[in-house]
Amino acid sequence: MMSFVQCGTWFLLTLLHPSLILAQQSNVDELGCNYLGQSYESRDVWKPEPCQICVCDSGSVLCDDIMCDDEPLDCPNPEIPFGECCAICPQPSTPAPVIPDGNRPQGPKGDPGPPGIPGRNGDPGLPGQPGLPGPPGSPGICESCPTGGQNYSPQFDSYDVKSGVGGMGGYPGPAGPPGPPGPPGSSGHPGSPGSPGYQGPPGEPGQAGPAGPPGPPGAIGPSGPAGKDGESGRPGRPGERGLPGPPGIKGPAGIPGFPGMKGHRGFDGRNGEKGETGAPGLKGENGLPGDNGAPGPMGPRGAPGERGRPGLPGAAGARGNDGARGSDGQPGPPGPPGTAGFPGSPGAKGEVGPAGSPGSNGSPGQRGEPGPQGHAGAQGPPGPPGNNGSPGGKGEMGPAGIPGAPGLLGARGPPGPAGANGAPGQRGPSGEPGKNGAKGEPGARGERGEAGSPGIPGPKGEDGKDGSPGEPGANGVPGNPGERGAPGFRGPAGPNGAPGEKGPAGERGGPGPAGPRGVAGEPGRDGTPGGPGIRGMPGSPGGPGNDGKPGPPGSQGESGRPGPPGPSGPRGQPGVMGFPGPKGNDGAPGKNGERGGPGGPGLPGPAGKNGETGPQGPPGPTGAPGDKGDAGPPGPQGLQGIPGTSGPPGENGKPGEPGPKGEAGAPGVPGGKGDSGAPGERGPPGTAGTPGLRGGAGPPGPEGGKGPAGPPGPPGTSGPPGLQGMPGERGGPGSPGPKGEKGEPGGAGADGVPGKDGPRGPAGPIGPPGPAGQPGDKGEGGAPGLPGIAGPRGGPGERGEHGPPGPAGFPGAPGQNGEPGAKGERGAPGEKGEGGPPGAAGPPGGSGPAGPPGPQGVKGERGSPGGPGAAGFPGGRGLPGPPGNNGNPGPPGPSGAPGKDGPPGPAGNSGSPGNPGVAGPKGDAGQPGEKGPPGAQGPPGSPGPLGIAGLTGARGLAGPPGMPGPRGSPGPQGIKGESGKPGASGHNGERGPPGPQGLPGQPGTAGEPGRDGNPGSDGQPGRDGSPGGKGDRGENGSPGAPGAPGHPGPPGPVGPSGKNGDRGETGPAGPSGAPGPAGARGAPGPQGPRGDKGETGERGSNGIKGHRGFPGNPGPPGSPGAAGHQGAVGSPGPAGPRGPVGPHGPPGKDGSSGHPGPIGPPGPRGNRGERGSEGSPGHPGQPGPPGPPGAPGPCCGGGAAIAGVGGEKSGGFSPYYGDDPMDFKINTEEIMSSLKSVNGQIESLISPDGSRKNPARNCRDLKFCHPELKSGEYWVDPNQGCKMDAIKVFCNMETGETCINASPMTVPRKHWWTDAGAEKKHVWFGESMNGGFQFSYGNPDLPEDVLDVQLAFLRLLSSRASQNITYHCKNSIAYMDQANGNVKKSLKLMGSNEGEFKAEGNSKFTYTVLEDGCTKHTGEWSKTVFEYQTRKAMRLPIIDIAPYDIGGPDQEFGVDIGPVCFL
């Protein structure tokens, strides 16, 4: 039903005067309307709400409220249908009447139809029969139903309301009784539009409609002036961690680091492959094969023969019993160093076992460092003379070449041509086989002899001892980067960077939807004072702003805490040679290596300490006695030598006790020179001869050929450490020894090259540091350090086979001997030859009984030259290291196969002179052969196991900065870190250009600043900023992966010889011991007397020219060159892309107060002053001019009457007509007084004096106008209105501060708070405590709003503010908790803008403590003084205080509220 039906009466629409609301409109087109997002045609009528109806009128929306009749309905339960506004009586549930359309049941109730055509008033009729229900009508407009009808606006008359047409209304008739509801009528045809009704009077404003859609953007206004910088926003949360960036460009190689710790000993490597069989030698001339004769009877002892050529090595015999300790032999020349094995891990030190029998001699250890000067030993008895060595050919000394890099193993060279047969020598008489004589001193060095025929390959020797690690190699190509490490702990916040320049203004964005009201901004520049605004509601915080342009790089931050070490990256390339590392622990002895071939003679070592005098050995044939030469001075400490091959680990035996001294034997008679006899069996020991006179020093003789291996002698005492030998080729990896004790920490390795970024790891929360884990698996072996301190000297090894002597070359890798050459042709018969020439050499048999000496054969043709050995790694000369302790001798290894001849090495330094030897005949000088080709490179050994990670080394020198890598993709979002400590203030940025004018906003009322909002949501991660400046040197990082082993260092210098020991007493001859293993080769004795010149050897064929050697190792890094000249300034690079705005830096520190501004313009003219006091009388004036002529005198009798009437006496004449001057009393004093008063008032307006009558604006103005005033109380009127609201303040005339006291100024000291809760918390004094109050300031007699206004103006006039609060405590902590060492129990202060000031956190909101006496509970009263200073004057004064450590029965406090001072 329509609402006018519900009201019960039809009213003429002409009487309705509705109040229409013109809603916000938007011209959709010329006729249509847009309302709340819906489009309507012109003249459409709709109901946005049940009690509101709207119509579209040519683009304008007119809406009105539907008012219902207040009269009660005549039904028991009226109801409001859905979508309707007014209540109706419910329909009785009767069958649906027949309607014109046909028989159909009544449908659901339709919407109200539009109003029908109003008819004229008829006469009141009788109550009619109930009519049929009418069709539903649309809601009518009801404004004042209580008047008996509804107001329908005449404006609706002309609109299509989807139903009848409204006509002009008639006058209302009396209301008839309501009829029962009729049946629904059929819809009428649309009526034609009625004529427009009269315009109704405007209604009262309706309630504001909902906000319309935003209007189109206005034109851009002129640029406004830039506002002051707002307060810094809170920093956004860290952006998500970006994806790992692409790998950076490979940086340049870093400066070599220090060598790492000595690695653990690696496993023994597999045996190397057997070398190729050498080419067969040239066939020699056929000799007459002789059968081996049966051993004849032992002949008489012949004169000692010449030293025979070395025989083939015999098979290793069974170990003989340990013989008695022999006398110390001369130290042999250092053997070639074995290949460097991986250092073994040191084994646990075993307990000292029982003294074992001395083991057979091990293979010779490498030369140790010179030991310290020992005490002189007793002079030992001279040994019996040895057999004369066969003279060697004297070689010419070649210049020492620069050590080449290791050459590849060359192919076996072809056999050289056969030499011509030598002339047969004269046969000497056969002598008895002489006893083995003691070794004679070496004779003068002979010329180089011919090479012997190749021997049968000997058995493969055991692996040599591990060599010392070579020097580090050059830095390799940087390895691939390791995987990305886990995020480190958050470091402390660095200092704030300088603020960046203001970026250019961005393009104007479209207007966004209205955001929430932002927090009130900081005060702008001083404007003209406005009237007090209405207090607004605090706004909610605005959303985060767009990212701005990145600022310039910040100042250098402090070093962050070191992050946890990342995972080891892949192994990098070998680094450049590092500095020498400290000595590592001795490794456990490795397995005995196979016997190596003899190397070239090493550099002579200095003489070591004399050993203890051993028991005298059996005497040899009498030699020419020589005196022992003086020992040289001790040499400087050499570097650690390369470790020799170690034998299998044996238990350390205790050194044997020295045997009893034997008596000195008589010297034997030297025999004549005979042919070399076959080695006879060992005869009984002869008596020792008397020591011979010391012979003159001869030139050093050539080194004799190697004799057959004698039975092992007893182990000698440890000799002095020899010099460092040349490093040999690298051996295969040895088997792992037992784990040794932890070595000393090595030097720091070089900084590794940064690896590529690893794949993106998931961001995990940073956990607390865990306990130290178990040691991890062994890492890869670190780069070997420089040679450490010499290890204990090994026992003397068996003497290796002697190669053909040549100039000392780099030791080659031992090659296999070539096959024996074919028999040579038969030589010319020698004189007096008893036996035939010897047959081809058979395999070595066991030692048979000594046969009779055979005749000397004809000298065979020169054998083919053997293949050259591989070039060894050149060792660098190391720095001298401290001497090592002598080690226990190891057991001897089995004999190794002889090596191929190595190329000649550089000449060694002169050794200390040996005992004089018997002079040998001098040979003619032979031509030196050319250097043989280098041998082929051996197969690489298998890698050893990873060693245990070394301790962190000292930090290496910083490498040069790498090239900048390409930009990485953003990492994943990190966990939000704790707030950083406040950084130092940044510099003020330059003022940016004014931005474009924004859309004009509606003027809002100034709200009080709200409390700090919650932090905004995280901004999008910014793009990478430009790189910052170089940071301070960080703490040591975790050690990088060890580099590959470097090349060996150069050999160290030769140390000086040791001093001569005292001569020992001659011991008695001991019984013959069982033959002992051969002792280590002694050091060269002093130079013997010059031997006779040997026969001229045949000229050897020229050797094949060797391959070109590899380039030498890179030298150590040179010292930095002088700085180059300053380069020209480069052209400026192109501008980079605009980066995002960095996070807001913290506000800078409060700047110093500015200079006083200029004096303002004169104020407006003041009011008229009060009337001044009357001035003093002036001086008499000058006489006036003569007056006009007087009136005619009396005449004719009538004058008396005239005179009586108008004469002066009667007062009838005006004084103007008299002769006396006028008395004009001009009060000059009054005028001057008024001027002075006006002038004073103007002066007091321009320069107020701070009195109640002339208050100043603030104390700073007062100080500028009246600098002579002293500090004290004055009146100020900051709002410059009526002076009646001036306030009394304290002016500090030294600073210009305006200080306002609190009222009251103290909080009494007592127990204010009882806390029943278990947890303590901050409790605000004014908000929560019983009897508490918030602090007020100023004169309490003035109204509170007056003080608020004056304070507000005072804040606007001030650039900074400060205030002190004194907290008196009794058993209450105010700031620092002495027991816990933190400030968690410190007070909070609340500022006037409801901001909180704390002890720690954002520096803008932290107070300082001037005195802290409340650090513990003492039961006594004490105090803590807080101070807060800020450049944001709106934050002060402090209005409340919140203690934390209160609530206990014995906890009391009070407060002194200091004045708040504005400047």
UniProtKB/Swiss-Prot annotation:
| Membrane-spanning ranges | none
| Propeptide segments, given as residue ranges | 24-154, 1219-1463
Q: Where is the VWFC domain?
A: 31-90
Q: Which spans does this entry mark as compositional bias, Low complexity? A: 186-198, 250-259, 310-321, 354-379, 399-429, 481-502, 606-615, 637-652, 678-691, 907-934, 945-960, 1068-1084, 1120-1132
Q: Please indicate if the UniProt record lists Glycoprotein as a keyword.
A: yes
The protein's predominant localisation is: secreted
Which cysteines pair up through disulfides? They are: 1259-1291, 1299-1461, 1369-1414
Which SUPFAM superfamilies does the record cross-reference, listed alphabetically? FnI-like domain
Q: Name one GO molecular function term.
A: extracellular matrix structural constituent conferring tensile strength
Domain of life here? Eukaryota
5-hydroxylysine occurs at 262, 283, 859, 976, 1093, 1105
Bias (Polar residues) ranges: 147-156
Positions with biased composition (Pro residues): 174-184, 709-718, 889-906, 1045-1054, 1180-1192
Q: Which UniProt keywords are present, listed alphabetically?
A: Calcium, Collagen, Disulfide bond, Extracellular matrix, Glycoprotein, Hydroxylation, Metal-binding, Repeat, Secreted, Signal
InterPro entries according to UniProt:
Collagen, Collagen_Structural_Proteins, Fib_collagen_C, VWF_dom
Here the segments flagged for biased composition (Gly residues) are 164-173, 389-398, 527-548, 668-677, 692-708, 835-849, 863-879
Q: Which GO terms describe its cellular component?
A: collagen trimer; collagen type III trimer; collagen-containing extracellular matrix; extracellular matrix; extracellular space
* Protein name, UniProt field: Collagen alpha-1(III) chain
Tell me which species this is from. Rattus norvegicus
Q: What is the lineage of its organism?
A: Eukaryota, Metazoa, Chordata, Craniata, Vertebrata
